[in-house]
Structures are given as structure tokens and as C-alpha cells.
Amino acid sequence: MSNILQNIFIDYYEHILYELHPRQTEIENISKMIHCGDPSYGGAFFACPDCGELNFVPFRCNSRFCPSCGNMYNQKRSFHMSCKLVNCVHRHCVFTIPEELRIYFLNDRSLLNCLFHSVRDVVLRMFHKQNKAELFTPGFILVLHTFGRDLKWNPHIHALISEGGAGNHTVWRPCTHFDFRFLRNSFRKVLLDQLTNKIGKSFCKVKNEMYSKHAEGFYVRAKPNHCKPDVTIKYISRYLGRPVIATSRIDTYDGDNVTFHYTRHEDNQTITECIPALDFIKRLIVHIPEKHFKMLRYYGIYAKHHKQESKLHKCISSEKHRYLCKFYNWQNMILLTFGYDPLKCPKCGKSMFAFEVYYKKTALFEQYRKVMGYG
């Protein structure tokens, strides 16, 4: 049974191909999402050893653009993120860019790497300058969101930063003071310098305008939010791993127009928009990342082994990690996401086993082309 998002894309699939001229990665993700759960694309037969009941479970698309599979992916990703966290307070910071710069990142998506590199350099510098002998290194996770609540193109970085760092000699030093002025000015300088190196001299005029218009730096939200470890883990699952839009935010679709709602940042008012379906699709697909592009990245002590790592206490111990990993298998993820146990016999309730697996028939050349990466 298809969801409302699948229905919208199925109805407008030809319009997408011939009017919007989507990127290759957009076509691939849209096609996967449309056929997610389609039995004709393969699946597995499960049999009950007691009553002989057969149950067919279709394959899922595993696309992050799909609301169902994207939710499963985010649950797994949130779990692995939480296993890396040191047992300390973390601060949620948001690094934004002026509206005038957004078009550059839309026209050349490789520039999105500059956002990650700029935030990384600024955060590490803020900690390193506290003590040049110790070079305190925090643990931080950066997540790129290219969308605002209204679904329009608005690339920005969400950072989850430990309020403390590991030094060359000191195991851990707390750091509760984040220098707002340093963050704003340094982020502006580093990002504009990187963009100038990538784009060239043609960007110099824009760079000078940015310094004039944003004399106090680019906006960085870094207020203390008292994210204790247990709150941090819940926060990661709820916010950092969220999809572009949840199906619960889509109110109606009448075949021509889509009505959806969101909560406006400025005043927390619920805003309802009704726009043509094709415009709604355009707002969504622009946020599909290029293939193999990492939207989430680990830095500092979370990126690699640090000499003090063995002495640091994690939010989730290694024993608990091994235990919880058992619950993140295919069966339990289906149960958590879709609300049913695919291996439970619908008649007698006993556990079923895999009986046979079916795959969609494809030409040998198509399989070869996919493996070799042609086309």
C-alpha cells in the first residue's frame, strides 16, 4: 500500500522527467521510493514450520529519500552516533550562511564541503587556543541540512559539540564558555576564504560585500542548552536525523495541489501552505544529495582514536552497545518502523523462517552496467 508521498510522485513522474530535468541521483532516488515495497521488484517468502502458512515480504528500497526507509536509516544512524558520545554535556550549535550565498551552493554542490571544513576548522581552533601545549580536542558531530522548515533551499550546519576536550597530557578539561564573537567572525572569514579559493577571483566582489553587510560575522547559534547525555541521545534521534518532510506534515493532496504545514522559527506559529504538486516536488528533490556525499561527519575525538580515548567514559558502554546491536536487525527495524513483525505467523503466531527469495529479473547487461557504474 503506497503512502501519500509515493502517490504524488507516481502521478507526476513523467512531468518530473520531462519538465524538471532532474539530476541522475534524483531520478534514482525517486524511482526507488516509488517502487518501495512493490512485490514485482522482488521479496522473500517466509514459511511457518507449524501450520505451513506462507507470507511474502517485498524488498524495500533503502533510499534515504523514502519516508519509510529513511526513517529506518535514521534510527540506525542515531544509534551509532549515540554510541560515540562521551558522557558529558553537549551543546547544539547552528552555523548559517547569508541568503545571498545560498545560490552558489545550489549551483555547485561540491561547495557544500566548504561548510563542513569551515565549521571543523573554527571549532578546533576555539579549543586549541585555550592551551597551545595541551591542544584540547573536543568531540563533535556535524550534520548538513539543506532545507528550512518551509522546504526551501537553505544549507546550514547543525553541530553537536562536547563541552570539554581531551588534551595531550590532561585526560579531560570541561569548557562551558563558547566565544560567540570568535565563532561568528571566524566562520565568516574561513568560509569566504574557502569559497574564494574554489570559485576564483570572480567571487572577490561578493566576498567584500559580505564583510560590509555582515560586519559582526555570520549568524551562529551557540547558546547553552544543557544537553545532558540522556537528553542528547533522544535529541539526536528526533532532530539531527530527520527527513526533509515527514508524511504527517502533508495534510492533503487532491491530484493538483499539496497542502502541508510547518512551525515557523520566528514566532512558533503553525503555517499552512497549499502549492501546486509540481512545485512541491521541486522543493523536495533539490535536497537529494549527490551519490556518496556524506551529510553527517565526525570530527575531533569522535573521528579517530585519541590517546586519552581509553580513559573517557562513553554514554553507552561497549557491553551495552553489543547488547543493543542485537535489536537493530532487519526484523526489529520493520517492527519499529511499520508496526508489525514480518517473521510472526499471522495464523498461529509462531516464528517463520525464510523459505525462498525472489529477485526482479534483469538483463545480464543491466547487471553488468550497474556493477561497473556505467550510465
Locate each region found by the language model.
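Beta->alpha loop/short-helix hinge microenvironment recognizer with preference
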Residues: M1-G375
